[in-house]
């Protein structure tokens, strides 16, 4: 990502104006955008716990400076946009290959350790090529629905594991400690089955050591990412800990993915030995498809590693928050349980999950409301490849623009009682919000490629869990707030009771 900010005095000769901008509107420059001073901005980040409160800083910034403001960190100036209409205006001006703020430390790891970039770290034409390969297998609803049978057995194993974990270390017979940890295992098992076509053992009574190492690395890499991104690169030599930790985490994840990809490659070679290409069997997992497309092993490993990471956090955090909120709103849980049991035959989940469950309005509304309150990625970004206009401001080419999705999804102008869990708001109760107010999966070409798969996993998991259990809060537990760890996570462990129905 180019980090240089263009001078405010530049001539605006390549500005793309929005159609709604009136001819009498006055264009203003980057230097006219309000925002905190650099010392104040840095104090908020490093002296007041701002790195773990980045989502809250979005809300505070919008309240203090309005829908658009800017802040500087060294030579890098970031423009923050916290109004859904302005977010839409910016995203509608995307180029053929939209560029977002790259996780520079991730890209640097790939370069130094000679690893291939996957869909999360690739840019430009390489990103476009990978996206074009993977999108038909993940983004089309019918393609995602094809994994229902695979995921059904994973969800059934999750239910069995929750039964085993009840009462362990808690003194309460139905209490499961740290449900997010259990759902991390579920998320990895599910995405692993889709990507690799094999089970990883995450939900067994004894989890394989390399799987435990991978799960720990996923949690650790987001913490080290925040630290390394906040530090200038020259500081990595003086304070080597965060960078060394990030490299260790990524190396462990790459080793895990490489081991399983090579196993699939070896199995395919034995199975297909001596057969002409037209007679080779078709596989249903993504690694098989990438091999057939003659993608290099190094590139397959890079993509599998990054997709495993993305799949784990999206499902585990959203499922944790969903059951947390449902446990605190028993009337919603009861209504959802009735909707599920009234529409689905528990004996035929694998056949009905992708069809019947996706048509249940309250189930979809619960997931949508959870993602509004707790978007996995609280903010997104774009780096325009030309001068663009956002509101009445000209944003120069190569300026980092942060889209404050957490702030827009809790905007009282868009959502009545925005901090309250109310799935009914998505069922026609009250005025409809701006369509860009809540964008948990992003928008356009850079939208989350695993959206359909994540929604399917969440629907299937909630359906089976609520069919088997009534979920209750931990007795006497205080409310749990979110915190930023690159992604949005619970600030402390969530413990829940799973009572047999």
From Swiss-Prot:
Keywords from the UniProt entry: Heme, Iron, Lipid metabolism, Membrane, Metal-binding, Mitochondrion, Monooxygenase, Oxidoreductase, Transit peptide
E.C. number(s) listed in UniProt: 1.14.15.18
Compartment annotation: Mitochondrion membrane
One Pfam family linked to the record: p450
Keyword Mitochondrion: yes
Pathway where this protein functions: Hormone biosynthesis; cholecalciferol biosynthesis
Tissue: Kidney.
Cofactor dependency: heme
Disulfide-linked positions: none
PROSITE patterns per the UniProt record, alphabetical: CYTOCHROME_P450 (PS00086)
Residues where heme binds: 448
GO biological process: bone mineralization; calcitriol biosynthetic process from calciol; calcium ion homeostasis; calcium ion transport; decidualization; G1 to G0 transition; lactation; negative regulation of bone trabecula formation
Taxonomic superkingdom: Eukaryota
GO molecular function annotations of the record: calcidiol 1-monooxygenase activity; heme binding; iron ion binding; secalciferol 1-monooxygenase activity
Gene Ontology CC terms, in alphabetical order: cytoplasm; mitochondrial membrane; mitochondrion
Reaction(s) catalysed by this chain's protein: calcidiol + 2 reduced [adrenodoxin] + O2 + 2 H(+) = calcitriol + 2 oxidized [adrenodoxin] + H2O; secalciferol + 2 reduced [adrenodoxin] + O2 + 2 H(+) = calcitetrol + 2 oxidized [adrenodoxin] + H2O
Keyword check for Metal-binding: yes
InterPro entries associated with the record: CYP11_CYP27_families (IPR050479), Cyt_P450 (IPR001128), Cyt_P450_CS (IPR017972), Cyt_P450_E_grp-I (IPR002401), Cyt_P450_sf (IPR036396)
Function: Catalyzes the conversion of 25-hydroxyvitamin D3 (25(OH)D3) to 1-alpha,25-dihydroxyvitamin D3 (1alpha,25(OH)(2)D3), and of 24,25-dihydroxyvitamin D3 (24,25(OH)(2)D3) to 1-alpha,24,25-trihydroxyvitamin D3 (1alpha,24,25(OH)(3)D3). Is also active with 25-hydroxy-24-oxo-vitamin D3. Plays an important role in normal bone growth, calcium metabolism, and tissue differentiation.
Similarity annotation: Belongs to the cytochrome P450 family.
Protein name: 25-hydroxyvitamin D-1 alpha hydroxylase, mitochondrial
